[in-house]
Amino acid sequence: MKVLIVFAHHEPRSYNALLRDRAEAVLASAGHEVRLSDLYAMGFDPVAGPRDVGAAAGEGPVNLLLAQRDAAARGTFSEDIRREMEKVAWADFLLVVCPVWWFSVPAILKGWFDRVLAAGFAYDFGRIYDKGLLRGKRGMLCVTTGGPEALYHRDAPHGATLDQILWPVTDGTLHFCGLDVLPTFVAWSVFQAGDAGRAEYLVQLEQRLRALEQTAPLPGHGFTK
């Protein structure tokens, strides 16, 4: 299997980096091909705009969705986007490793979604969910939280489960583009987990990754037009 790891954390010595490294090692040892997009290390620009699609200044208002579709047809995406699109097209499996910030993912990762999972490449009019342009691929989030699992329930302070909080990413982004999305791996409350707890999360991640082929995706839904 060909796996693309998309990593979004500014600190190369972070626990997220340990999760990334363990994932890369486990997947490689299982015979999978692994590529990495380390967004901070790459200096990836998260700001989407006309320059992404070869639109010149002064040409008038740019509808980015339509411009992306045109760039996909003409092959005029900027070089940094083309490189990432090539990785996505190559991959069978997309593993996203990041912390949960502000009930979502880091801005640099959101920008990667905005720029790389572009119209005409990852989805199109009438080509979403089970008809998405990336159908046949699978994906999974691997995230860390600052707070414990007990905070993430309807009757708890956050008022929602983490699955509900991350729904815009798992369903509204990855599944929207056609991916079958596996259940999210969560390392809860990494600040308070202690060395033993953090070590156990690494073991649990390894077990999850070694069972990828046997893991059923989250319930999805189709698109009817």
Task: Enumerate the language-model features and the residues they cover.
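Glycine-rich phosphate/pyrophosphate-binding loop and the adjoining helix
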Residues: 152-225
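Short, conserved loop/helix-junction motifs that constitute active-site signature segments
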Residues: 131-136
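N-terminal beta1-alpha1-beta2 submodule of the flavodoxin-like/Rossmannoid cofactor-binding fold
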Residues: 1-121, 203-225
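Residues at the starts of beta-strands that form the adenosine-phosphate
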Residues: 2, 33, 138-139, 180-181
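Short, solvent-exposed loop/turn segments at secondary-structure junctions
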Residues: 104-105, 149-152
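A gly/proline- and charged-residue-enriched helix-loop-helix capping module
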Residues: 124-128
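Short, well-ordered beta-strand core segments
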Residues: 94, 139-140
